[in-house]
């Protein structure tokens, strides 16, 4: 089954905030690598969406996006809805999606 990725406004904002932070505080290269890793991870999720860990919300799953961020998402019909990208430096249990 082919799944379509749908970005919520929150997930899109989170992604762009991280990209901006990396460009401003690290380098354009760091931002590009983050984008590439994110795309690879999203491809894996689209291929096998039920492998990651479920959260306390029965329909919400989470997966480690990289060393510093976790991605929350849900699967509805043929859609994978990306809910948010949350930094590990914050308490993940305080995320509204956990």
Each predicted region: which residue ranges?
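Enriched for short, Lys/Arg-rich terminal
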Residues: 68-70, 74-98
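Basic/aromatic recognition patch in beta-strand/loop cores that engages polyanionic ligands
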Residues: 40, 48-80
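Arg/Lys-rich, positively charged N-terminal/basic patches that mediate binding to nucleic acids
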Residues: 1-35
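Alpha-helix N-cap/helix-start and coil->helix boundary motif
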Residues: 12-13, 39, 70, 89
């Amino acid at each position: 089954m082919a799944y379509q990725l749908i970005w919520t406004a929150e997930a899109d904002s989170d992604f762009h905030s991280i990209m901006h932070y990396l460009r401003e505080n690290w380098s354009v290269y760091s931002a590009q690598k983050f984008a590439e890793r994110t795309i690879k991870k999203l491809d894996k999720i689209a291929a096998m969406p039920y492998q990651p860990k479920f959260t306390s919300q029965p329909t919400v799953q989470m997966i480690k996006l990289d060393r510093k961020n976790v991605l929350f998402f849900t699967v509805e019909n043929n859609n994978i809805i990306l809910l948010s990208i949350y930094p590990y430096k914050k308490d993940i249990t305080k995320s509204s999606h956990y």
